[in-house]
């Protein structure tokens, strides 16, 4: 079966869509860490049979060691779940995704890959950004070839012929991995104990939809959330100036309405896509994330309970070793959290 892990700070409607879309796209069970105190979101996720939720906004999960940066919190949380799933027979793959992402894959082909294929790479498809918050999220940009990028530059669509300029979000995609103690989940790609990036199997049927700032309103909401969740997030070089500008603007202590208006100006100048030109060139892919291709398969209730009880016990641990190992230290933490190995839920190690 397929599992996912996410660290989330989003509205209830956004979380509802995030869960529904990923469960309809091949994920069987989702583990969601709530990065802010949101009683309505917590209630919804707690009641969902295909979701395990962790309240991770304060000392109940982190003790006195809550990382300042969102990326670090995501990294810790993903690797806790990865480690716990090395003891779970039901979880064949784990995908680390954000709340604005949807896996886009062929589940049948994925499950036919040989056992020695331990990592898969999901190429990004980025939702076009237009000033229409009600537009259906069905038009996506793919990564372009060098020649296609030169054409876009010549047409004045981008200032520089690079996918890093063309995409507003990440170009690195995401990854899925078979849970193992010597592989560590990253934000985009897994690493080994030496923190070296590990290669993954790629195919046209492996992708991730990124609903990155699909509209002016979404752009304003996203950056307000990100920049009130800790230090300025790490971004690729092509976006550094824009993020610096947004961070500076938010910290000027201007009236909220004025800040939102100026954020909207930044959106118009730097983010809004020339959808008409991209459409005429045939550069857009059509995907409907709400057209469920799969129904989530049910993980046995006893296995879900084991996972959730283990997560509760991990809350009291020092989680540093989960991020980068070594494996024997992670093994000891697992023994402390879930007990020593026994058949069934605790019967596997890779």
Each model region followed by its residue ranges:
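N-proximal low-complexity "stem/linker" segments adjacent to membrane-targeting elements
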Residues: 1-23
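Long, low-complexity, intrinsically disordered segments
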Residues: 340-350
């Amino acid at each position: 079966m397929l599992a996912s892990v996410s660290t989330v700070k989003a509205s209830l409607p956004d979380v509802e869509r995030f869960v529904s879309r990923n469960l309809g796209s091949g994920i069987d069970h989702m583990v969601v860490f709530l990065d802010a105190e949101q009683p309505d979101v917590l209630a919804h996720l707690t009641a969902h049979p295909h979701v395990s939720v962790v309240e991770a906004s304060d000392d109940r999960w982190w003790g006195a060691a809550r990382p300042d940066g969102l990326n670090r919190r995501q990294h810790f949380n993903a690797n806790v779940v990865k480690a716990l799933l090395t003891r779970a027979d039901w979880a064949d793959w784990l995908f680390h995704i954000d709340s604005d992402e949807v896996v886009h894959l062929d589940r049948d082909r994925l499950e036919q890959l040989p056992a020695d294929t331990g990592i898969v790479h999901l190429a990004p498809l980025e939702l076009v950004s237009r000033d229409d918050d009600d537009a259906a999220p069905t038009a996506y940009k793919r990564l372009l070839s060098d020649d296609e990028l030169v054409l876009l530059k010549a047409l004045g669509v981008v200032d520089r012929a690079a996918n890093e300029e063309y995409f507003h979000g990440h170009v690195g995609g995401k990854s899925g991995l078979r849970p193992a103690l010597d592989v560590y989940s990253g934000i985009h790609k897994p690493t080994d104990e030496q923190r070296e990036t590990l290669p993954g199997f790629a195919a046209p049927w492996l992708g991730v939809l990124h609903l990155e700032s699909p509209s002016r309103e979404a752009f304003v909401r996203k950056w307000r959330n990100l920049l009130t969740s800790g230090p300025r997030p790490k971004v690729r070089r092509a976006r550094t100036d824009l993020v610096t500008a947004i961070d500076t603007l938010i910290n000027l202590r201007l009236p909220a309405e004025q800040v939102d208006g100026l954020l909207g100006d930044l959106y118009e100048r730097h983010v809004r896509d020339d959808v008409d030109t991209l459409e005429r060139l045939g550069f857009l892919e059509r995907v409907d994330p709400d057209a469920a291709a799969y129904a989530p398969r049910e993980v046995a209730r006893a296995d879900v309970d084991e996972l959730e009880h283990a997560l509760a016990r991990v809350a009291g641990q020092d989680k540093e070793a989960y991020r980068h190992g070594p494996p024997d230290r992670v093994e000891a933490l697992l023994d402390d959290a879930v007990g020593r190995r026994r058949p069934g839920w605790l019967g596997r190690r890779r």
